[in-house]
Amino acid sequence: MNPGAILVFENFIEKDLINKTLEEIKNYDWKPVWANKRYAGDFWMTCPLIEDFTKTPNFNTFALAKVIEEKMQCKIVNLMFYAMLPGGNIPPHRDMVGNVGFGGLRLHVPIITNPKVNFVVARKRVIMSTGELWALDTSYTHSVSNYGEENRIHLVMDVIVNDWVLKLLPPKNIKFYLHQFHLILLGFLKFFKYFTSKDLKLKDFLHVVYNSIKLKLFKK
């Protein structure tokens, strides 16, 4: 089992609703995920439905959005369509928005895909089929490339982990806690590297931290 990508339901969304969604989204004016085109440039596009818990004007355009809202027994932070165009590539990376240990999880529902999509999580290729529901822990290294000739469109949601969400996932085991420890260690090393690269002496940094804490504790 891949700890970073877990198949939750095989038939989460019916084919008729998938086809309806493809018709509804056909004329949407896609926007780049990153305005500065940091990842994949114009090859990675988005259609936001919920942003920071708030529905966008796009939400009521799609019947699928309402179905998802009814199905999910948890808080949805973000809900969006992501389109990876042919030739698009997002290099290996990790982020904490979907780290179960930090209280978040990212869920994917493929709307349209093709056999030449190469989605890799924790160094293992993950093949997602249309209509399935997948849980992705984004704290594991992941990447995606679309070598096919069709767009790869997923409905993606960031949710807050609660008891209902936890029941969708395998029980936490020693590997889970070792992974969290690994992330903390990586964060510490990155933190340390940042300050040493700025020629900031450790004792000076600790002095700044001490004064900041003292200020917060004793300010009136």
Features from the language model and the residues they span:
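Non-heme Fe(II)/2-oxoglutarate
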Residues: M1-Q73
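Phosphate-end processing signature that detects enzymes handling 5′-triphosphorylated RNA
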Residues: V126-S145, H154-V156
